[in-house]
Regions:
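PRPP-associated nucleotide enzymes
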Residues: 1-212
Length: 212
């Protein structure tokens, strides 16, 4: 795959360890859900090294001191439904004051193209750093459509987080939206004829919610 300045593969031993757990078909729904949240927390930690901050004065038991804190109201989390919901709580662990929106999409199994069915976003989202999340970046169709919806609403700083990415999807999003920072935990081999990532982990939504 070509290299892109806006694509970041988070090569960290803790993330690799947890990705191995969610790949395993023997992993239970409960454990899968928990580990997805843990990976999301680790990814958000890396992706938000440039999080907006401000200076405040804190009173310690001994004296006053100037400290740097996060502007928590400057962040919005937007999961692509339904699998993206599995990553939200992990990110809220770091940013409990973040606003949460939702973009609902499903994949047409014949065309493999995304179909939007729901979009509800926080007020003034155009003033926030938006973290768009989906565990899988496969064809890139859903991610691109979701990014377009955010840009239509004036969003200027968007970060897209996916736990597992396929080269086809990563390239598509990177080329169509070079202004969006893309973070993946791991880059897999390819897509199969049905648009699933190989080796992947199966259907993330089904495994998070225990459905078939």
């Amino acid at each position: 795959m070509k290299t892109y300045p806006n694509v970041h593969v988070l090569d960290h031993p803790l993330i690799r360890h947890k990705v191995a757990i969610i790949r395993d078909k023997a992993t239970t729904t409960k454990q899968f859900r928990e580990v997805i949240e843990e990976i999301a927390t680790l990814m958000a930690y890396e992706a938000f090294k440039d999080v907006p901050t401000k200076k405040i004065v804190v009173e310690t038991p001994l004296e006053s001191v100037e400290q740097t804190v996060v502007k928590e109201n400057s962040i919005a989390i937007v999961p692509i439904l339904r699998a993206g919901l599995g990553m939200v709580n992990g990110i809220l662990t770091l940013f409990p004051a973040a606003k949460v929106g939702h973009i609902g999409m499903y994949r047409n199994e014949e065309t493999l193209e995304p179909q939007e069915y729901y979009c509800k976003l926080p007020a003034h989202i155009d003033e926030k750093v938006v973290m768009l999340v989906d565990p899988m970046l496969a064809t890139g169709g859903s991610a691109c459509d979701a990014i377009i919806q955010l840009k239509k609403r004036g969003c200027k700083k968007i970060k897209f987080l996916a736990i597992i990415g396929a080269p086809e999807g990563v390239e598509k999003v990177a080329e169509k939206h070079p202004d969006v920072e893309i973070y993946v935990s791991t880059l897999d081999r390819c897509l199969n004829e049905n648009g699933y990532i190989l080796p992947g982990l199966g259907d993330a939504g089904d495994r998070i919610f225990g459905t078939k």
